[in-house]
């Protein structure tokens, strides 16, 4: 395997990568049963035409994936990273006056990040800001949880979230922090204009400095019996 390539697993993650012309795919490993099922479900698409395909048994795929990793569903692909656009380039070149971008403060669990990516695509969020040092960019768990969403969402890796938010505020973005002590119900906001939706880590929430520099603090209404939700459900 190339030094720059990595493995992604799972039906939706691999199929969406195959459909993405911007994604370079080195090889695909799959069982014969998985290929038959995929061809039946995608009869109008010849998804394997331009890639090297290697048929493997389920046990061989288990070994390739790693026993402690996520279920592969009979399908694994060796891929390269997508070419990235920097956040600065995206903001400066985008003429849309209505943008919603999620920013994550020290959220590190790959399953949670993958679920956030999947939800962001479903709700037509325009991008995701993550801290480069703690972002598991090549995680099989992240790709599996995202169910192909990585292929459809701009992910901006930055060195410092606080500095990034200050820059975005100079570009007319409003920063809205989601916090248990928020004073406003997020469902009552129209979310027009340019917005940054800031979420904190699973264990510690949003850093105080980021909260102090936010324009708004929103809460998610819940039963009084439960104090907090996992980040992936927010």
Label each PLM-derived region with a short phrase.
Residues 33, 58-60, 133-135, 202-204, ...:
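Short, acidic/turn-prone active-site loops that include or flank metal/cofactor-
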Residues 8, 52-57, 154-162, 218:
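Short acidic-hydrophobic, aromatic-tinged amphipathic segments that line or gate anion-handling sites
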Residues 88-95, 167-169, 187-191:
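Short amphipathic alpha-helix with an adjacent loop that forms part of the alpha/beta core around
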Residues 176-230:
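Active-site/ligand-binding-proximal alpha/beta "capping" segment
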Residues 1-92:
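N-terminal positively charged helical leader segments and presequences
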Residues 23, 94-182:
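RNA substrate-binding interface of SAM-dependent RNA methyltransferases
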Residues 37, 135-141, 204-210:
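Short, glycine/polar-rich helix-capping loops at beta-to-alpha or helix-loop-helix junctions
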Residues 20, 26, 122, 143-149, ...:
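Structured adenosyl-cofactor binding patch, chiefly the S-adenosyl-L-methionine
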């Amino acid at each position: 395997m190339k030094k720059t390539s990595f493995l992604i697993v799972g039906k939706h993650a691999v199929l969406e990568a195959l459909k993405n012309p911007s994604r370079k795919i080195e090889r695909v490993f799959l069982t014969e049963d998985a290929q038959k099922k995929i061809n039946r479900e995608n009869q109008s698409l010849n998804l394997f035409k331009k890639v090297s395909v290697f048929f493997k048994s389920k046990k061989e795929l288990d070994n390739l994936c790693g026993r402690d990793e996520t279920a592969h569903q009979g399908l694994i692909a060796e891929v390269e990273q997508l070419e990235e656009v920097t956040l600065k380039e995206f903001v400066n070149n985008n003429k849309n006056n209505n943008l919603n971008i999620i920013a994550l403060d020290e959220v590190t669990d790959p399953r949670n990040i993958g679920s956030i990516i999947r939800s962001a695509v479903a709700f037509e969020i325009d991008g995701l800001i993550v801290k480069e040092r703690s972002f598991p960019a090549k995680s099989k768990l992240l790709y599996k949880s995202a169910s192909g969403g990585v292929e459809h969402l701009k992910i901006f890796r930055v060195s410092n979230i606080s500095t990034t938010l200050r820059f975005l505020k100079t570009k007319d973005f409003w920063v809205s922090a989601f916090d248990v002590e928020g004073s406003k119900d997020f469902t009552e906001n129209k979310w027009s204009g340019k917005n940054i939706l800031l979420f904190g880590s699973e264990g510690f929430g949003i850093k105080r400095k980021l909260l102090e520099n936010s324009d708004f603090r929103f809460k998610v209404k819940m039963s009084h019996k439960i104090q907090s939700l996992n980040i992936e459900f927010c």
